[in-house]
Amino acid sequence: MPQKAQPQPRESPFKPARQQPGLACEECRKRKARCDRAKPQCGSCMMTGRVCVVNHNRPRRGPKKGQIESLYSRLGRFIHGSLCISCWKAGMLTVTEVLEEQVIEQMEHIYHPDFEPNSHPRHSQSHDRRQQSGPDSSPDTQHELPFLQSPPAARDADSAERALLPSPVSPVRAMTAQELSYARTGSNPTQNPGLDLILADLDQLYFDRVHPIAPFLHQQRHLSQREAESSVLARACLRSAMRTVAAAMSAQYRRFADSLYIETSRVVQELDTIERTPSLKQIQAVLLLAHYELLRMEENRALATVGRCFRLIQLARLQDTDPSTDAGAGRDFVKEEETRRTFWVAYCFDRFLTSRNEWPFTLQEEAIWIRLPVSESAFQIPRPPEQPMDYLHEAIASSGQKTLPPFAEYIVLATLHGRTMNLRRSALLLSTSTEASMFWERHRALSDIVEKRSALWSYSPSATTPLVTADPLTAFTCLLEKTLIIYLGKVGQTAREQLGGMSERRLIENANSAVQNLATSEQETLMNCHSHSRSFDIGTGGRGGHASGGLQRSAQTAAEFVALAKFMCPVNCFRICSDKSVRRLTLSFQMQYPAQQSFLLRMEMPPRLEKYGMNVGERGTGRIRAIDHASRLKVDERRAVRAYL
């Protein structure tokens, strides 16, 4: 029996390690070469003949124990607790925000040495938004830096609610509260030169950044009476509102805006219970609060506040404060001009704030009896004008005759914008020919006013200034002028779409009826008038009077047809008419307006009208322009119709 073969040992699939366990020698570490860790000498040192030394007491990599905690503590003391360490470790704050917070804390420490920045958590608004959406800080971080952590309620609350939490008051708000307390009780506030500099800086920031878009305060009088009227609560409330808006528009003091807003709102509510008649300062303070809410809060809240301001204006009757006579020698020009400018700022606020959602206006144009404001230079000098400014309706009626200051021009354009918005509302309700005719008359009148003002404004020194170097109000006035032209065009397009949606059958029936009336009962009268066009007089009696009555009746019929058929009317309405009928319709419609120089009549016309001198487009339709000029009609009938695509 054959003997079984012994199984051969299988080779291991794993190759031996290229390196021995242990540490690399110092020579290999120095040369950054791979060390095989052979004993007593590695292969690299054996080949080069170097001494192979292994250091078994090498220190561990990374920072030393307690070094990270020390760095966190130094960072927290450096920025005075203005950053949350969890957001900083997560990379949710930029270097710019860190530096901004650092500068603000250093200024507070310089101006107010008794104020402890580490005594309560402080966060910027952008930091709060990121902290709400960012990850929570780890327990280790909270244990390491407890003074940098804010309470959960403060992290989740918004800016207004966070200011109401029991925490130490910021120095600017504390100083403002002292001034308001002095206005209530008459006790002198604590003098602090450092905080006085901050408040003076906020006052100057207001006139640099807020006043150009809301120019209703006289700068010199306000700054000179800052200390003299500190005991008046309304004046202190206005100053607080000014600093609130100025802080909101400044990156340096933005963190104080919410606290100032809450303090100002409380005083405004207190004034409502004290003042029986709203004062001018109270109205100005509420108007600035509405401006702040529009910048920093929801739009609905700003609408509620500005509506309250409008009611205060109506209670104080600012809209009719100008007397019918000229200002006397004993009148205060600055106070009167501040009253006018306060009303006009609120008026423009009403026009543009409600135009976004097309809400009705609160301050109606018909109830205004107050003059337009003078130029900014005449107001700040102050220098009363030799001739008083026009009223609003006078300035609109004299469009194209004289230029106005930028603020006054801005008010007129805001009024025209409001009229255009009302015209758009009426365009959505067009259903009859009479309504359509009235709409286009109003549209044409508005277009003429805007065209005249645009032509005159383009040559004024304010309009020729580059927008980059111009003040904000002048730049916005130039943009508003161009926007108003575009808005009028869109309103006209809305009306065309509304008229185009009318029943086509109804248009054709009215057109058939109008053409039949012209072709039967009035055809002889029209031809008779045409043959005696050179000697025809509408005002004569006898046969001429009979012809005049027939012409007027036919013109009314033709005008009714044209009003139904114009502006994107179906072409079929004209195809049922003969060439002579359309020609008679046009001439009859012109004779209804003998006093007009010209008018624009846009209609979709069939291609066969090309033989009357009308340019026809590629699609076979063109837009004609009928010019009502008596002399041209008598000389040549063909010049009564001009073609425009």
Curated annotation (Swiss-Prot):
Per the entry, what this protein does is: Transcription factors AN6788 and AN6790 act in tandem to regulate the expression of the non-reducing polyketide synthase pkfA from the aspernidine A biosynthesis cluster. They do not control the expression of the other genes involved in aspernidine A biosynthesis, nor do they regulate the expression of the highly reducing polyketide synthase AN6791 and the esterase AN6793 with which they are predicted to form a secondary metabolite biosynthesis cluster.
Q: Per the annotation, which location comes first and is thus the protein's main one?
A: nucleus
Instruction: Please list the GO terms describing molecular function.
Output: DNA binding; DNA-binding transcription factor activity, RNA polymerase II-specific; zinc ion binding
Q: What is this protein called?
A: Transcription factor AN6788
Q: A single GO CC term, please?
A: nucleus
For the biological process aspect of GO, one term held by this record is: DNA-templated transcription
The record ties this protein, via PROSITE patterns, to: ZN2_CY6_FUNGAL_1 (PS00463), ZN2_CY6_FUNGAL_2 (PS50048)
Q: Which organism is it from?
A: Emericella nidulans (strain FGSC A4 / ATCC 38163 / CBS 112.46 / NRRL 194 / M139)
Q: Point out the DNA-binding stretch(es).
A: 25-52
Q: Which InterPro entries match?
A: TF_fung, Transcription_factor_dom_fun, Zn2-C6_fun-type_DNA-bd_sf, Zn2Cys6_DnaBD
Disordered as annotated region, ranges: 1-21, 113-170
Keyword line: DNA-binding, Metal-binding, Nucleus, Transcription, Transcription regulation
Upper lineage: Eukaryota, Fungi, Dikarya, Ascomycota, Pezizomycotina
